[in-house]
Amino acid sequence: MLKDIFLFWGSLFGYDHTAIYIFHFLLVVAITMFIAVAVTKSMRLVPRGLQNIIEAYLSGVIALGKDAMGSEKLARKYMPLIATIGFIVFLSNIIGLIPGFEAPTASLNLTLSLTLCVFFYYHFEGIREKGFIKYFAGFCGPVKAIAPFMFVIEVISHLSRIISLSFRLFGNIKGDDLFLLVMLTLAPVLVPMIPYALLSFMAILQAFIFMVLSYVYLAGAVVVDEEH
C-alpha cells in the first residue's frame, strides 16, 4: 500500500528505484527546458507572468552571488550555472511532495553528480583564472615550513566538500520523503497540510544552501586575495 501511494510510476519499472529516480529527474529536466523555452520565446521589455517570476529569481541569484563572492561581475558570470542547478534542485525537491512521485534528490546518485559538477567546475575555473601552479600553491598556505602539511589538509578539506554537499542534500530530502510518507499513512488528508508547508520550505531552503555553497566554493577558487 505504501508503494502504491508514493511510487505510482514504480509499476512501470517494476519498483526499480534507480529507474524511478532517473524517470523523475528526466521529468524535472524536461520541465526546466520547457520553462526556459516558454520564457525566452516571447520576452517583453516590461516582464509579466512567468518571465517576471524567472527574472526575479535570476536577480535573486545574482544578489546571492554578489554577497558570496563580493563581486557582481563574478556573480553574473557564474549565474547561469548556479541558477540552473538551483532550479533543478528545487524542482527535484518539490516534486517529491506530490503523491505518486519521488524526489530525484532523494537519490545519492543525483546529489553526488550535481556536487561533482560543482567540484570539478570550481577547480577548473580556479586553474584558468590563476594558473595551475599558483592555484595549487594556494593550498600550501603562507608559511613555507608547514606547506606540505597544509597542502594535505587542504586536499582533504576540498574532498570533504563532495561528501558534505551531496550527503546534506540527499539526507534532508530522503528524510523529508519518509516523514511525509508516514504522515500521509497515519493522518487524514487535511492534517498533513502543515507538514506540506514545512517540507515546501525545506525544499526551497536546501536549494538555497546548495547555491550559496556553490558560490562560496567558486569564490574561494577564483577570487584573488587582493580583491578581498
Swiss-Prot record:
Q: Where are the transmembrane segments?
A: 19-39, 81-101, 107-127, 136-156, 178-198, 204-224
What is an annotated GO biological process for this record, any one? proton motive force-driven plasma membrane ATP synthesis
- Which top-rank group of organisms is this from? Bacteria
Key word Transmembrane helix present = yes
Q: Which UniProt keywords apply?
A: ATP synthesis, Cell inner membrane, Cell membrane, CF(0), Hydrogen ion transport, Ion transport, Membrane, Transmembrane, Transmembrane helix, Transport
* Keyword Thylakoid (UniProt): no
Protein localization: Cell inner membrane
Q: What is its main location?
A: membrane
Q: Which PROSITE patterns match?
A: ATPASE_A
UniProt xrefs under Gene3D superfamilies: ATP synthase, F0 complex, subunit A
Q: List cellular component terms (GO).
A: plasma membrane; proton-transporting ATP synthase complex
Q: What does this protein do?
A: Key component of the proton channel; it plays a direct role in the translocation of protons across the membrane.
| NCBIfam families (UniProt xref) | ATP_synt_6_or_A (TIGR01131), PRK05815.2-3 (NF004481)
- What is this protein identified as? ATP synthase subunit a
